[in-house]
Structure formats: C-alpha cells, structure tokens
C-alpha cells in the first residue's frame, strides 16, 4: 500500500500570528516556484495556538495546499481546565492534525501514557488525525535498546482508538531532538518497523500498512533523503529547521536527492 509521505513542521513556541502568516506565504511561494507536487509529499505546519486562526484564514483564502494543526490538545471535552484547548476547538479551526505526546510535553509537563491515550481518543472523536509522538531518552537507549520504550508508549496510546481511526506516528528519539545528532536511518528504520508491528498487533495488518510513521530529531536537508530511503519511514516531524523557509522547503523537496 502506497503511503503519501508527510513532512510536518513543529514551530513550538516560536512566531506570532503575523510572523506565521509571513512564513506560510513564503513557504507556499517557494514550493510553488520549485514545482512541488503536494500530492506526492504532503506538507503540514504546527503554529502556536494563537496563530491558528490567522493560518486557517490565509490557507482558505489563498487555497494553499498546506495542512495545519495544533501542538497539543486537552484530554477533556470542555470545562474548568484553565489554559487547555479542546479538540473541538481545533476542529472548528479546520485543523487536520494535532501533535500528541511530544517529548517536551512528557518531560516538562509530566504527561503520562494515560493522558496521551486520552488526548489521542479526543482527537479521533473530533475528526482530527493525531500525530502520536514516541521516543526514548539516552538512558532508555542504554538500558533497554532503541525500540522498547517507543513500543510501550505507542501500545498505550492506541488503547483508546479503533481500526477506523486515521492517525500518524512520529518516532523522535529524545536524545536527538535539538541536539544536532540525528539517529541513523538504520536506527530509525529498526524502530519504525517495530512500531508498525505494534499497530498490526493492536489494529490489524491493513491499518498498519496504511499508517504513516515519521522520524523526528535533528532532521535537516542534508540527512532527510537517507531517512526517506527506508521502507518504514514515511516522512519527518521537523523542529527548528522548519522555521527557516529555505531549509524547510529543501527538506520537503527531498525527493530530488533520493536515488
């Protein structure tokens, strides 16, 4: 089964709404000028929540073939949860995706596997495709190997959804994020294959075959092609490099470097 690659840019807590508009416009122009085929490689951006309405308006008005989504979502429908964002709010903004379980959420906000599962279920219930992030720390890697922790995290996240759900998995080794030291393509492939096996076990072979698995962690234009040659790697979740339009566009256009 052919899986359309997805290159997603997580802007984290960077860019205000005016800056986000400028970056999306410049990215769209750059890719259009380069003749990018959006049907061959999907593009998505994840601005801060305060920027989403501006990005939605721009994408709709200019009919830009760029998807967008939230960086996190609440595990609750609504209520007295100060500062949280309901999945229904993201759906009202026509967000296609939402990032769930990013290592920064797990580490800085002590997010548990149970919360990740609840957030994943909320996204699916509201028609949003969750990008479920999993990954091991350097200590985990040394103690348990590369795939043990990501496999356990994904297994927990899938507990709240069924085979009809549309979701994406992002493998982000914590030791690689923002470090400049990426995993090797072979390491990413090993873990991605293990994650696909977990999906097959939980939801069946058909779901596993169609689910996209991304790699994230110090992705740049100079190494993306190596990851994309691997059988089970279907794209990338890009952090800091996605803030540089020229660099992000070069990552998106990785196919010209793949032989």
UniProtKB/Swiss-Prot annotation:
Stored InterPro entries: Aldolase_TIM (IPR013785), TIM_sf (IPR035990), TrioseP_Isoase_bac/euk (IPR022896), Triosephosphate_isomerase (IPR000652), Triosephosphate_isomerase_AS (IPR020861)
Record-linked Pfam families: TIM (PF00121)
Catalytic activity as recorded in UniProt: D-glyceraldehyde 3-phosphate = dihydroxyacetone phosphate
Record-listed substrate binding positions: 10-12, 178, 218, 239-240
UniProt pathway annotation: Carbohydrate biosynthesis; gluconeogenesis; Carbohydrate degradation; glycolysis; D-glyceraldehyde 3-phosphate from glycerone phosphate: step 1/1
Enzyme type, top EC level: isomerase
Predominant cellular place of this UniProt entry's protein: cytoplasm
Keyword Cytoplasm recorded: yes
GO biological process terms, semicolon-separated: gluconeogenesis; glyceraldehyde-3-phosphate biosynthetic process; glycerol catabolic process; glycolytic process
Stored SUPFAM superfamilies: Triosephosphate isomerase (TIM) (SSF51351)
Alphabetized Gene3D superfamilies for the sequence: Aldolase class I
Keywords for this protein: Cytoplasm, Gluconeogenesis, Glycolysis, Isomerase
Superkingdom: Bacteria
Enzyme Commission designation: 5.3.1.1
Localization per Swiss-Prot or TrEMBL: Cytoplasm
Residues the record marks as active site: 102, 172
GO molecular function terms listed in the Swiss-Prot or TrEMBL record: triose-phosphate isomerase activity
GO cellular component, one term: cytosol
Keyword DNA-binding recorded: no
Quaternary structure (record): Homodimer.
Role summary: Involved in the gluconeogenesis. Catalyzes stereospecifically the conversion of dihydroxyacetone phosphate (DHAP) to D-glyceraldehyde-3-phosphate (G3P).
Family of the protein in this entry: Belongs to the triosephosphate isomerase family.
Cited PANTHER family: TRIOSEPHOSPHATE ISOMERASE
Official protein name in the record: Triosephosphate isomerase
Organism of origin: Leifsonia xyli subsp. xyli (strain CTCB07)
Lineage, highest ranks first: Bacteria, Bacillati, Actinomycetota, Actinomycetes, Micrococcales
């Amino acid at each position: 089964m052919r899986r359309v690659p997805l290159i997603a840019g997580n802007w984290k807590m960077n860019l205000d709404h005016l800056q986000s508009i400028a970056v999306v416009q410049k990215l769209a122009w750059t890719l259009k000028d380069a003749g990018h085929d959006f049907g061959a490689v999907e593009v998505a951006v994840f601005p801060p929540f305060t920027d989403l309405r501006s990005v939605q308006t721009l994408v709709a008005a200019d009919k830009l073939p760029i998807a967008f989504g939230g960086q996190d979502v609440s595990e609750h429908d609504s209520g007295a949860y100060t500062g949280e964002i309901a999945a229904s709010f993201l759906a009202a903004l026509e967000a296609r995706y939402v990032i769930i379980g990013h290592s920064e959420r797990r580490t800085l906000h002590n997010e548990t596997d149970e919360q990740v599962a609840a957030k994943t279920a909320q996204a699916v219930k509201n028609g949003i495709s969750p990008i479920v992030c999993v990954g091991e720390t350097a200590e985990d890697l040394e103690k348990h190997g590369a795939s043990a922790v990501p496999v356990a995290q994904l297994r927990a996240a899938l507990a709240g959804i069924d085979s009809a759900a549309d979701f994406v998995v992002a493998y982000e080794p914590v030791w690689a994020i923002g470090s400049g030291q990426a995993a090797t393509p072979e390491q990413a492939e090993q873990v991605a294959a293990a994650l696909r096996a977990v999906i097959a076990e939980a939801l069946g072979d058909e779901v596993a075959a169609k689910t996209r698995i991304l790699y994230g962690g110090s992705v740049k234009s100079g190494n993306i092609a190596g990851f994309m040659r691997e059988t089970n790697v279907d794209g990338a979740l890009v952090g800091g490099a996605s803030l540089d339009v020229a660099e992000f566009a070069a990552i998106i256009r990785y196919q010209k470097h793949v032989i």
